[in-house]
Amino acid sequence: MRSQPSPGWRDGIDAAPWAPSATRDALRLRAWLNRLVREFFHARQVLEVETPILSAAGNTEPNIDGFQTRFSGHVDAGTPLRWLRTSPEYPLKRLLAAGVGDCYELGRVFRNGEAGGRHNPEFTMLEWYRVGWDHLRLADEAVELVQQALSLVGRNAEVVSTTYRELFVQDAGVDPFTASDEKLQAPLREFGIEGEGLSRDDWLDLLMTHRIQPDFPADRITVVHDWPASQCALAKIRQPVAGSGEPAVAERFELYLGRFELANGYHELTDAAEQRARFLSDNRVRAGRGAVQPPLDEHLLAALAAGLPDCAGVALGIERLLMAMLGTERIAEVLAFDFARA
């Protein structure tokens, strides 16, 4: 997919500060990927929608920080303090509750706190929802989309699907549900991690990012499903059969291409009271860390109370997918202008 640069084009991240951080080829690939995404969902009769980027509510997830801004004009309805969305999830669910059916959005989202390497505060997210599906069926569709994307660069990938428990036992030698905290920490000693204040889930995340994920083969799509209930986020929790001795699990999956985490999907929680409790729990964690506690999304909670249909949803990072397709570790190489050049 080589193309001839136009006169004056400064190609790539090492060019002058005013010039693009991506090559022309990378920008073309992004355009082709956007077209592929839209054709993929058009063929499946999934409706493209656009939802607000500014919201009166923020994301309470303890490990995600949002940007705040203030409207300077006259406002009769609602607070002038607004949040840039970290995902389109909440308004998309409101559309689902209103009866829009299967839908997706391809648009910009914003997350505060990290820039450089694999991260940019502004990036593109693809998020879609399927009514009547669970997380496993949606994972299959996400795999199909990634495989089609790989065809744009003449690549293909084998697919491995595993439970969270199977993955940790096989690749780290520990059972994530029953191992002691000491056993979880043992494989990470060589990294010299300061453990003060880290929770069990933090150690599990570190095992994934430091010991397991780096060994995923570059030409393999790995789907990891049925996560610990403590990492449920906005997913349903499946209780075990009585007397089975099995743990409760979150009906959630993550999808990786090589070492790149691309997508995070849920069999969506539909219970408004439980969702409110999770939001409040998130904000208690944030308060303990001295972090901002965003206002809850009361519109979402009202939509859940009105009736969110049984559905599954997934968010996929477009830049991460492009990076994995091109084999680069720098997000700047797939952005016209990264944060430093914006």
Q: What are these language model-derived features?
A:
Residues F40-R44, A149-L152, P214:
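Short alpha-helical functional segments enriched in proximate histidine and acidic residues
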